[in-house]
Amino acid sequence: MSATALGMIIFAYLCGSISSAILVCRIARLPDPRENGSGNPGATNVLRIGGRVAAAAVLVFDILKGMLPVWLAYKLDVPPLYLGLTAIAACLGHIYPVFFHFRGGKGVATAFGAIAPIGWDLTGLMTGTWLLTVLLSGYSSLGAIISALIAPFYVWWFKPQFTFPVAMLSCLILMRHHDNIQRLWRGQEGKIWGVFRKKKNDAAEQEEKKEE
């Protein structure tokens, strides 16, 4: 392994360790996402406890912190295997952040960002798969699970040299969704539409209180 490849892997892990969910919630004076909602410091939980603007900020940052290290490694001609390890390192940083006592999220947005530099065609397919699954089922977690399962096949079709690292990344995502898989199996997983309904109901209650 070259010094460049090793440096990019370390850089990716440190980038991933910057938990945007926690930082955004602190800046916006929202509750700690690790202690509220689902307990997961990710965009979906921030949507639940803080609203769309905060969630969008978290989502964009989480994607970028996976995309930037991999894109830089690609520009520095890091070999495909170590490019894949750079992507995995970014996700491991998100899941086990050194700056936040190793309590992180599930790595879906960061993994998406890390895979994006492979190609826009692949990025479009991954986005379409997630959106279609969520629209049909209403489950954000199921969208992530299906996308993780299919991602290695998409990569094998477009850029086969990255299949093994992406497969490892998919396994990592699936492991982090173990509890979600169990709740889906039992029919206990909450649908993403429920978050919007709750926000709407809360807003209506606040309006009623103002009128009183």
Swiss-Prot record:
The chain crosses the membrane at residues 5-25, 53-73, 80-100, 112-132, 138-158. It catalyses: an acyl phosphate + sn-glycerol 3-phosphate = a 1-acyl-sn-glycero-3-phosphate + phosphate. InterPro entries: G3P_acylTferase_PlsY. GO terms for cellular component: plasma membrane. Pathway: Lipid metabolism; phospholipid metabolism. The keyword Acetylation does not apply. It is a multi-pass membrane protein. GO terms for molecular function: acyl-phosphate glycerol-3-phosphate acyltransferase activity. Its EC number is 2.3.1.275. Keywords: Cell inner membrane, Cell membrane, Lipid biosynthesis, Lipid metabolism, Membrane, Phospholipid biosynthesis, Phospholipid metabolism, Transferase, Transmembrane, Transmembrane helix. It is found in: Cell inner membrane. GO terms for biological process: phospholipid biosynthetic process. Disulfide bonds: none annotated. Belongs to the PlsY family. Probably interacts with PlsX. Catalyzes the transfer of an acyl group from acyl-phosphate (acyl-PO(4)) to glycerol-3-phosphate (G3P) to form lysophosphatidic acid (LPA). This enzyme utilizes acyl-phosphate as fatty acyl donor, but not acyl-CoA or acyl-ACP. PANTHER family: GLYCEROL-3-PHOSPHATE ACYLTRANSFERASE-RELATED, INNER MEMBRANE PROTEIN YGIH. This is Glycerol-3-phosphate acyltransferase. The lineage of its organism: Bacteria, Pseudomonadati, Pseudomonadota, Gammaproteobacteria, Enterobacterales.
